Amino acid sequence: MILNRLEVRGLRILRHVRMDPVSGLNLVHGVNGAGKTSLLEAIHLLSTGHSFRTRQLSPLLAPDCDAVEVVARIQSTGGGEPWPVGIRKTRDSTTARIRGENVRSLADLARLLPLQVMHPESHLLVSGGPGYRRAFLDWGCFHTDPAYHDHWRRYRHLLCQRNAALRDRSPARLLSAWDTALGEAGSALDLARATHLQTLLPYLDSLKQELPETSGLALEYRRGWNPEESLSESLAHSVQRDRSAGFTQVGPHRAELLCRLDGRPVAQVASRGQQKSVVLMLKMAQSLWLMETLGFPPVVLVDDLPAELDARHRGWLMNCLQGLGSQVFVTAIESDQVPLSGWDSWQMFHVEHGTLRVGD
């Protein structure tokens, strides 16, 4: 899917902006604070219901505005008639629409418009806590397994119920019932995550040859409980410890994707530049996999490309994105900081004081 029209109202400095993106590279340039990143936030909001910089609405609201609204037209990468999608967020409600109809879940928008995002905090995928890497695996599972989101929601609901039962000192009989249900839902998540990682490995091996500094990268998935036991068994065995702690200490919510470079944790031994190379490779591997699995690539957002990558890695990334066939939105202060060679479809946009115009 691609965007061929984007309209933003009330988001930070963007009071009302309209954009007609091309199907290839869309380069948005301008000085810091002009609204470049806000434009990418709007696209992310349209797909996921939140910004990649914050999940809070208040920082996004333009002065004297009580709502953020993003509407767009999307169409298949193969052509065909575009159709409208949109989202409106206030402090009290969120409304999303596809083809004029309200959607029951924001997951419907996310499935329609898969996004990969690279921004100044993307290094947290390898240097941050385990939650960042669980989210990486969950993204892939969500976009290829129609049941995954339901499993994930059920697991989160059951986990909250079990934690409440632990804090309330509920009898063992009730906890046992939660353990059985939680074990079933959690095992489904675990299987999907482990399977997704295995499908990514061939893509990662191929990309390692193009980025020599990542040749020693190895990934290991740890499920979050004793691999010799079922989840229900581990939950039963951890009841007393969980009662003392007041929360559940085993399960896929404690899973980890270990990233090692030459046998040592990437976060400990890799420079910030090496960490960015690993993140690039992980994101590109997942994008290539999505393309082959679904038949179309994700839309890719790259915020402040020149600040994030040196010239060699900028060239490598842009070549990869050309080959992938993604619609790409890139921000930069200066337009000449982004390589344009090889793009059949590209357009420059200049942002100044929250207004957008086409041109160099």
From Swiss-Prot:
Organism listed in the record: Thioalkalivibrio sulfidiphilus (strain HL-EbGR7)
Biological role stated in the UniProt entry: The RecF protein is involved in DNA metabolism; it is required for DNA replication and normal SOS inducibility. RecF binds preferentially to single-stranded, linear DNA. It also seems to bind ATP.
Main location: cytoplasm
Signal peptide: none
Example of a GO cellular component annotation carried by this entry: cytoplasm
PANTHER family: DNA REPLICATION AND REPAIR PROTEIN RECF (PTHR32182:SF0)
Compartments (UniProt record): Cytoplasm
Keyword Nucleotide-binding attached: yes
Protein name: DNA replication and repair protein RecF
UniProt similarity note: Belongs to the RecF family.
Annotated residues for binding of ATP: G30, V31, N32, G33, A34, G35, K36, T37
